[in-house]
């Protein structure tokens, strides 16, 4: 009866047919116990040696990270790279927090510095503040960059007192005596209205509107004109002040010696025949007539001298011979002469 019953296989043979198929397809080699311990020890020694080299006591402490610079940041497109992979070893995962060096402030948080060409910020048109004393280069700044520290100072300078925008530029007085024009009281717009079209040099641009000058702008010229006896003009041009008082004084004719002598007409003529000489002075003609008549009214009164002369200057030169007076002296040497023509001849020798 026992032989007639069918013999069934054991339960363990078909408990896991999939596992049996996998084992038959990929046979697994069991490693030896001794070699596994040696490999594990070598891996641990390598990891410990690498960790001690990276975290040695001889390395100086790293400086604290500096704060990030003031600039625009934008997130990098794309998914961030994974910090770890499933294939990383056990030792690498354990030592990752100790071996990772702190990243720089510019790349912390997976942010990159944006180039200046990508950022475009629409701003209202700027007008140079004439009376606020701010340089145009500081007020505008480079395009595409955000300067927080510099814009704080320049913004306060451009806003003016009490945080208001600068008023429209007025024409300064043409004279230091005139009081400066103050802006009209009242609320100001945060931005100046756009200027209307106006004449420009070479191309379109904002037209500059000038207000009327101050009442005392021409006070200096009015006082000078009143002192000179000139009536002040009724109307004046906006940018054409009256002439300077110095120019008015120079325009008057000067009273004094002429720059060139006026040539006199020779009206005195000798009446002797075959002579016809003319002179500008009557005394010169009288002396000339004495040459024709032979008259010598000037006599030398020196004792023992009876010389006579027709001209007084000839008597004067003759009298110097008796006295020895020599008024004409050479400035290059010690010689002196009684006559000027003798000194002129002597000066030619020094030349």
UniProtKB/Swiss-Prot annotation:
<keyword id="KW-0805">Transcription regulation</keyword>
<dbReference type="GO" id="GO:0000122">
    <property type="term" value="P:negative regulation of transcription by RNA polymerase II"/>
</dbReference>
<dbReference type="GO" id="GO:0000902">
    <property type="term" value="P:cell morphogenesis"/>
</dbReference>
<keyword id="KW-0804">Transcription</keyword>
<feature type="compositionally biased region" description="Basic and acidic residues">
    <location>
        <begin position="21"/>
        <end position="31"/>
    </location>
</feature>
<keyword id="KW-0010">Activator</keyword>
<dbReference type="GO" id="GO:0003700">
    <property type="term" value="F:DNA-binding transcription factor activity"/>
</dbReference>
<feature type="region of interest" description="Interaction with WWP1">
    <location>
        <begin position="110"/>
        <end position="264"/>
    </location>
</feature>
<dbReference type="GO" id="GO:0051247">
    <property type="term" value="P:positive regulation of protein metabolic process"/>
</dbReference>
<dbReference type="GO" id="GO:0071356">
    <property type="term" value="P:cellular response to tumor necrosis factor"/>
</dbReference>
<dbReference type="GO" id="GO:0043249">
    <property type="term" value="P:erythrocyte maturation"/>
</dbReference>
<feature type="region of interest" description="Disordered">
    <location>
        <begin position="20"/>
        <end position="110"/>
    </location>
</feature>
<keyword id="KW-0479">Metal-binding</keyword>
<keyword id="KW-0677">Repeat</keyword>
<feature type="zinc finger region" description="C2H2-type 3">
    <location>
        <begin position="328"/>
        <end position="350"/>
    </location>
</feature>
<dbReference type="GO" id="GO:0008270">
    <property type="term" value="F:zinc ion binding"/>
</dbReference>
<keyword id="KW-0862">Zinc</keyword>
<dbReference type="GO" id="GO:0000978">
    <property type="term" value="F:RNA polymerase II cis-regulatory region sequence-specific DNA binding"/>
</dbReference>
<keyword id="KW-0539">Nucleus</keyword>
<dbReference type="GO" id="GO:0003677">
    <property type="term" value="F:DNA binding"/>
</dbReference>
<dbReference type="GO" id="GO:0045893">
    <property type="term" value="P:positive regulation of DNA-templated transcription"/>
</dbReference>
<keyword id="KW-0597">Phosphoprotein</keyword>
<feature type="short sequence motif" description="9aaTAD">
    <location>
        <begin position="42"/>
        <end position="50"/>
    </location>
</feature>
<dbReference type="GO" id="GO:0071498">
    <property type="term" value="P:cellular response to fluid shear stress"/>
</dbReference>
<feature type="region of interest" description="Disordered">
    <location>
        <begin position="156"/>
        <end position="209"/>
    </location>
</feature>
<dbReference type="GO" id="GO:0045429">
    <property type="term" value="P:positive regulation of nitric oxide biosynthetic process"/>
</dbReference>
<protein>
    <recommendedName>
        <fullName>Krueppel-like factor 2</fullName>
    </recommendedName>
</protein>
<feature type="modified residue" description="Phosphoserine">
    <location>
        <position position="243"/>
    </location>
</feature>
<dbReference type="GO" id="GO:0000785">
    <property type="term" value="C:chromatin"/>
</dbReference>
<keyword id="KW-0832">Ubl conjugation</keyword>
<comment type="subunit">
    <text>Interacts with WWP1.</text>
</comment>
<dbReference type="GO" id="GO:0000981">
    <property type="term" value="F:DNA-binding transcription factor activity, RNA polymerase II-specific"/>
</dbReference>
<dbReference type="GO" id="GO:0097533">
    <property type="term" value="P:cellular stress response to acid chemical"/>
</dbReference>
<dbReference type="GO" id="GO:0032715">
    <property type="term" value="P:negative regulation of interleukin-6 production"/>
</dbReference>
<feature type="compositionally biased region" description="Pro residues">
    <location>
        <begin position="163"/>
        <end position="197"/>
    </location>
</feature>
<feature type="modified residue" description="Phosphothreonine">
    <location>
        <position position="171"/>
    </location>
</feature>
<dbReference type="GO" id="GO:0071499">
    <property type="term" value="P:cellular response to laminar fluid shear stress"/>
</dbReference>
<dbReference type="GO" id="GO:0070301">
    <property type="term" value="P:cellular response to hydrogen peroxide"/>
</dbReference>
<feature type="zinc finger region" description="C2H2-type 2">
    <location>
        <begin position="298"/>
        <end position="322"/>
    </location>
</feature>
<keyword id="KW-0863">Zinc-finger</keyword>
<dbReference type="GO" id="GO:0071347">
    <property type="term" value="P:cellular response to interleukin-1"/>
</dbReference>
<comment type="function">
    <text>Transcription factor that binds to the CACCC box in the promoter of target genes such as HBB/beta globin or NOV and activates their transcription. Might be involved in transcriptional regulation by modulating the binding of the RARA nuclear receptor to RARE DNA elements.</text>
</comment>
């Amino acid at each position: 009866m026992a032989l007639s019953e069918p013999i069934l296989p054991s339960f363990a043979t078909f408990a896991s047919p999939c596992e049996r198929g996998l084992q038959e397809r990929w046979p697994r080699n069991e490693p030896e116990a001794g070699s596994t311990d040696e490999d594990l020890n070598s891996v641990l020694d390598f990891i410990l040696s690498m960790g001690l080299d990276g975290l040695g006591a001889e390395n100086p402490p790293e400086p604290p990270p500096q704060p990030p610079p003031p600039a625009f940041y934008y997130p990098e497109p794309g998914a961030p790279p994974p910090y770890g992979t499933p294939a990383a070893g056990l030792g690498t995962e354990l030592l990752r927090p100790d071996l990772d060096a702190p990243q720089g402030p510019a790349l912390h948080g997976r942010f990159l510095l944006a180039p200046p060409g990508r950022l475009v910020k629409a701003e209202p048109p700027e007008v140079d503040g004439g009376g606020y004393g701010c340089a145009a280069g500081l007020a505008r700044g480079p395009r595409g960059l955000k300067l927080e520290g510099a814009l704080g100072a320049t913004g306060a300078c451009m806003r003016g007192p009490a945080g208001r925008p600068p008023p429209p530029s007025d024409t300064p007085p043409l004279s230091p005596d005139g009081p400066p024009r103050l802006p009209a009281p009242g609320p100001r717009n945060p931005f100046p209205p756009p200027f209307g079209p106006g004449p420009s040099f070479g191309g379109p641009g904002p037209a500059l509107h000038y207000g009327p000058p101050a009442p005392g702008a021409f006070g200096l010229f009015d006082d000078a004109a009143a002192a000179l006896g000139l009536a002040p003009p009724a109307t004046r041009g906006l940018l054409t002040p009256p002439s300077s008082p110095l120019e008015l004084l120079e325009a008057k004719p000067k009273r004094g010696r002429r720059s060139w002598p006026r040539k006199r007409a020779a009206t005195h003529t000798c009446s002797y025949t075959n002579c016809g000489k003319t002179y500008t002075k009557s005394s010169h003609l009288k002396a000339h007539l004495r040459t024709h008549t032979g008259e010598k009214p000037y006599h030398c009164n020196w004792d023992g001298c009876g010389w006579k002369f027709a001209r007084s200057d000839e008597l004067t030169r003759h009298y110097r011979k008796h006295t020895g007076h020599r008024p004409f002296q050479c400035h290059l040497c010690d010689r002196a002469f009684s006559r000027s023509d003798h000194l002129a001849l002597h000066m030619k020798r020094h030349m």
